[in-house]
Amino acid sequence: MTKLYDYYKNNIIQNLMHKFNYRSIMQVPKIKKITINMGVGKSVTNKKLLEKATEDLMVISGQKPVITTARKSISSFKIRQGQPIGCKVTLRGSRMWEFLERFIFIAMPRIRDFRGLSIKSFDGHGNYSIGIREQIIFPEIDYDTVDDMRGMDITITTSAISDNEAYALLTAFRFPFRK
């Protein structure tokens, strides 16, 4: 696995057990999966944009993305039901740990005007969502081949019961939250 996973196994589990007074190691929250979603609204008129977004997401995650389709028709957006409008990847296991390590220590410091992550992005069940405006923060993306700046949503799903537990878990992973 990765250094981050070893750090979780050796340090974070013990720290969280003492902090929240867990009786078993199985009660300690862990990261279950990371979902990366890239919505391409302009793909309605230009199919090449969706192909490029899929390619970018594949390079970032190391896994082939699934094309997402519209659930229902919306005439004001010129979208029909079943029309492809984005792509997503769900990472688990070793790919998840590798992506998380690259995201925390390489990609996040490259975000322009970064002032820390918002604490308000927890969903109430211990999951955290981050919105990224540019895909070029990842070193795998070649800046010269980028045709359009595309954002993405990154959702970190944890086994934590409350937001406080998830916050403690992500802080232990050195997520830079705003004070």
Curated annotation (Swiss-Prot):
<dbReference type="InterPro" id="IPR031309">
    <property type="entry name" value="Ribosomal_uL5_C"/>
</dbReference>
<dbReference type="InterPro" id="IPR002132">
    <property type="entry name" value="Ribosomal_uL5"/>
</dbReference>
<dbReference type="GO" id="GO:0019843">
    <property type="term" value="F:rRNA binding"/>
</dbReference>
<keyword id="KW-0820">tRNA-binding</keyword>
<comment type="similarity">
    <text>Belongs to the universal ribosomal protein uL5 family.</text>
</comment>
<protein>
    <recommendedName>
        <fullName>Large ribosomal subunit protein uL5</fullName>
    </recommendedName>
</protein>
<keyword id="KW-0687">Ribonucleoprotein</keyword>
<comment type="subunit">
    <text>Part of the 50S ribosomal subunit; part of the 5S rRNA/L5/L18/L25 subcomplex. Contacts the 5S rRNA and the P site tRNA. Forms a bridge to the 30S subunit in the 70S ribosome.</text>
</comment>
<dbReference type="GO" id="GO:0003735">
    <property type="term" value="F:structural constituent of ribosome"/>
</dbReference>
<keyword id="KW-0699">rRNA-binding</keyword>
<dbReference type="InterPro" id="IPR022803">
    <property type="entry name" value="Ribosomal_uL5_dom_sf"/>
</dbReference>
<dbReference type="GO" id="GO:1990904">
    <property type="term" value="C:ribonucleoprotein complex"/>
</dbReference>
<dbReference type="InterPro" id="IPR020930">
    <property type="entry name" value="Ribosomal_uL5_bac-type"/>
</dbReference>
<comment type="function">
    <text>This is one of the proteins that bind and probably mediate the attachment of the 5S RNA into the large ribosomal subunit, where it forms part of the central protuberance. In the 70S ribosome it contacts protein S13 of the 30S subunit (bridge B1b), connecting the 2 subunits; this bridge is implicated in subunit movement. Contacts the P site tRNA; the 5S rRNA and some of its associated proteins might help stabilize positioning of ribosome-bound tRNAs.</text>
</comment>
<dbReference type="InterPro" id="IPR020929">
    <property type="entry name" value="Ribosomal_uL5_CS"/>
</dbReference>
<dbReference type="InterPro" id="IPR031310">
    <property type="entry name" value="Ribosomal_uL5_N"/>
</dbReference>
<keyword id="KW-0694">RNA-binding</keyword>
<dbReference type="Pfam" id="PF00281">
    <property type="entry name" value="Ribosomal_L5"/>
</dbReference>
<dbReference type="GO" id="GO:0000049">
    <property type="term" value="F:tRNA binding"/>
</dbReference>
<keyword id="KW-0689">Ribosomal protein</keyword>
<dbReference type="GO" id="GO:0005840">
    <property type="term" value="C:ribosome"/>
</dbReference>
<dbReference type="Pfam" id="PF00673">
    <property type="entry name" value="Ribosomal_L5_C"/>
</dbReference>
<dbReference type="GO" id="GO:0006412">
    <property type="term" value="P:translation"/>
</dbReference>
